[in-house]
Amino acid sequence: MKFKNFIAIICFVFLCGHSVLAQSSINEMVKEWERAKAYTKEYLDAMPDSGYALKPTADMRSFAEQMLHLTEANYGFASAATGEKSPIVRGEAEKAADKSKSNVTKMVMAGYDFVINNMRKMSPTQLNENVEMFDRFEMTKSAALAKCFEHQTHHRGQTTVYLRLAGAKPPQEKLF
C-alpha cells in the first residue's frame, strides 16, 4: 500500500511539474515576442519618414511593404495557431493605401499585440495540438508560432539594408 501511495505521489509531482514547465514555455514565448515587438519598433523608429517608400531595387518591396508583409504574416500564422479570427482580411495589410510611418507603425504594433495577446490565452495542451498551415503543412501550434517568429525575424533583418540605404543607423542587436 505504501508503495502505491509513493508511486501516486511521484506521478502527481511529475504531472504538476510538467504543467508548470509547459506554462513556463508559453511565458517564455510571450517574453520573446515582446522583445521582438520592441526590436521591430526600434527599426520602425530608425527609418526616416521619407524612407518608408524606399525600395532597394524596383522589383523589391518598399520598407513599408516589408513591415506590412511581416505583420500580415503575424496575423495569419497566429490566427491559425491560436484559433482566434484575424481582425484583418488576408492581403489587406500589405495593400494598405496609407504607408506612412505613423500608420505602418500602428499596424505593425497591432499585429504583434494580436500574436502576444492570443498566445497568452493558450493552454500548454493547445501548443501540442496539430494545425494545418497553408492547406498543406501539418505541424503543432507551437511549431507554427515558431515559424511565425522566424518569419518576422527574417523580414525585420532584411530591412537593415533599407535603413543603411536611407542613411539611418540600424538598431543594435537585441538578443536579450
Predicted regions and their residues:
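Bacterial Sec-dependent N-terminal signal peptides
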Residues: 1-25
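Hydrophobic alpha-helical segments, especially transmembrane helices
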Residues: 3-5, 19, 38, 157, ...
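Residues within well-ordered alpha-helical secondary structure of globular protein domains
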Residues: 12, 46, 69-72, 110
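Short, contiguous alpha-helical
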Residues: 30-34, 41, 49-92, 132-176
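Solvent-exposed, charged/polar functional surfaces in cytosolic regulatory/catalytic domains
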Residues: 39-42, 46, 110-118, 158
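Acidic/histidine-rich alpha-helical segments that form the ligand environment
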Residues: 96-132, 140-151
